[in-house]
Protein backbone atom coordinates (compact mmCIF):
# COMPACT_ATOMS: atom_id res chain seq x y z
CA UNK A 1 0.00 0.00 0.00
CA UNK A 2 1.34 3.45 -0.87
CA UNK A 3 0.47 6.65 0.83
CA UNK A 4 0.55 9.86 -1.07
CA UNK A 5 1.94 12.82 0.84
CA UNK A 6 0.77 16.19 -0.25
CA UNK A 7 2.74 19.33 0.45
CA UNK A 8 1.06 21.82 2.75
CA UNK A 9 -0.18 25.08 1.35
CA UNK A 10 2.38 27.85 1.16
CA UNK A 11 3.32 28.48 4.74
CA UNK A 12 5.78 31.09 5.84
CA UNK A 13 7.55 30.30 9.07
CA UNK A 14 9.17 33.24 10.78
CA UNK A 15 11.71 32.97 13.56
CA UNK A 16 10.59 35.21 16.39
CA UNK A 17 12.49 36.94 19.13
CA UNK A 18 14.60 34.46 21.02
CA UNK A 19 17.17 34.24 23.75
CA UNK A 20 19.47 31.61 25.13
CA UNK A 21 21.94 31.37 27.95
CA UNK A 22 23.41 29.59 30.90
CA UNK A 23 21.44 29.14 34.10
CA UNK A 24 22.52 28.46 37.64
CA UNK A 25 26.24 29.19 37.42
CA UNK A 26 27.28 28.53 41.00
CA UNK A 27 29.97 30.87 42.23
CA UNK A 28 31.44 30.50 45.69
CA UNK A 29 34.35 32.80 46.42
CA UNK A 30 36.37 32.68 49.62
CA UNK A 31 38.45 35.79 50.26
CA UNK A 32 41.50 34.90 52.34
CA UNK A 33 43.35 38.23 52.31
CA UNK A 34 43.18 38.47 56.10
CA UNK A 35 43.03 35.87 58.85
CA UNK A 36 39.25 36.45 59.02
CA UNK A 37 37.93 34.97 55.79
CA UNK A 38 34.90 36.23 53.85
CA UNK A 39 32.56 34.09 51.75
CA UNK A 40 30.37 35.07 48.80
CA UNK A 41 27.94 32.52 47.40
CA UNK A 42 26.03 33.34 44.20
CA UNK A 43 23.85 31.59 41.67
CA UNK A 44 24.05 33.51 38.36
CA UNK A 45 21.98 33.26 35.17
CA UNK A 46 22.95 34.79 31.82
CA UNK A 47 20.45 35.11 28.94
CA UNK A 48 21.56 36.79 25.71
CA UNK A 49 19.36 38.61 23.16
CA UNK A 50 20.34 39.26 19.56
CA UNK A 51 20.03 38.09 15.98
CA UNK A 52 20.70 34.36 16.09
CA UNK A 53 18.80 33.56 12.89
CA UNK A 54 21.83 32.01 11.16
CA UNK A 55 22.30 29.58 14.05
CA UNK A 56 18.69 28.41 13.88
CA UNK A 57 18.17 28.37 10.12
CA UNK A 58 21.62 27.61 8.69
CA UNK A 59 23.43 25.87 11.54
CA UNK A 60 26.01 28.69 11.58
CA UNK A 61 27.18 29.23 15.15
CA UNK A 62 29.59 32.03 14.24
CA UNK A 63 27.47 34.55 16.14
CA UNK A 64 26.70 32.41 19.14
CA UNK A 65 28.42 32.93 22.48
CA UNK A 66 28.74 29.42 23.88
CA UNK A 67 27.06 28.75 27.19
CA UNK A 68 30.38 27.59 28.64
CA UNK A 69 31.84 30.96 27.59
CA UNK A 70 29.05 32.65 29.51
CA UNK A 71 29.81 30.50 32.56
CA UNK A 72 33.56 31.12 32.33
CA UNK A 73 32.94 34.87 31.97
CA UNK A 74 31.08 34.82 35.29
CA UNK A 75 34.09 33.11 36.89
CA UNK A 76 36.59 35.40 35.16
CA UNK A 77 34.88 38.62 36.21
CA UNK A 78 34.54 37.32 39.77
CA UNK A 79 38.26 36.71 40.02
CA UNK A 80 38.82 40.29 41.22
CA UNK A 81 35.86 40.24 43.59
CA UNK A 82 32.13 40.46 43.17
CA UNK A 83 31.09 43.37 45.37
CA UNK A 84 27.37 44.16 45.26
CA UNK A 85 25.50 41.70 43.06
CA UNK A 86 23.79 44.54 41.20
CA UNK A 87 27.17 45.96 40.18
CA UNK A 88 28.38 42.50 39.19
CA UNK A 89 25.37 42.02 36.90
CA UNK A 90 26.06 45.40 35.30
CA UNK A 91 29.63 44.23 34.61
CA UNK A 92 28.28 41.08 32.95
CA UNK A 93 25.76 42.99 30.85
CA UNK A 94 28.32 45.57 29.74
CA UNK A 95 30.82 42.83 28.90
CA UNK A 96 28.49 40.82 26.67
CA UNK A 97 26.88 43.79 24.92
CA UNK A 98 30.25 45.54 24.53
CA UNK A 99 32.41 42.62 23.38
CA UNK A 100 29.97 41.00 20.96
CA UNK A 101 28.37 43.49 18.57
CA UNK A 102 25.55 41.10 17.67
CA UNK A 103 24.42 40.80 21.31
CA UNK A 104 21.80 43.52 21.58
CA UNK A 105 20.83 42.95 25.18
CA UNK A 106 20.02 40.30 27.68
CA UNK A 107 18.82 39.37 31.11
CA UNK A 108 21.20 38.63 33.92
CA UNK A 109 20.05 37.48 37.34
CA UNK A 110 21.75 36.55 40.59
CA UNK A 111 20.80 35.06 43.90
CA UNK A 112 23.16 35.67 46.80
CA UNK A 113 23.16 33.17 49.65
CA UNK A 114 24.50 34.22 53.02
CA UNK A 115 26.67 32.35 55.47
CA UNK A 116 26.94 32.91 59.22
CA UNK A 117 30.12 32.44 61.18
CA UNK A 118 30.17 29.48 63.53
CA UNK A 119 30.89 30.77 67.04
CA UNK A 120 32.54 33.89 65.58
CA UNK A 121 35.25 31.66 64.08
CA UNK A 122 37.56 33.30 61.52
CA UNK A 123 36.96 30.75 58.76
CA UNK A 124 34.12 28.39 59.70
CA UNK A 125 30.62 29.05 58.36
CA UNK A 126 27.12 27.60 58.22
CA UNK A 127 24.63 28.59 55.55
CA UNK A 128 21.94 31.07 56.56
CA UNK A 129 18.83 29.44 55.07
CA UNK A 130 16.48 32.32 55.90
CA UNK A 131 17.99 35.05 53.73
CA UNK A 132 18.51 35.22 49.94
CA UNK A 133 19.25 38.43 48.08
CA UNK A 134 18.16 38.66 44.44
CA UNK A 135 18.86 41.05 41.59
CA UNK A 136 17.93 41.15 37.90
CA UNK A 137 19.41 43.30 35.12
CA UNK A 138 17.66 43.65 31.77
CA UNK A 139 19.28 45.49 28.88
Regions found by a protein language model. Give the residues of each.
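N-terminal intrinsically disordered, cationic/polar leader segments
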Residues: 2-139
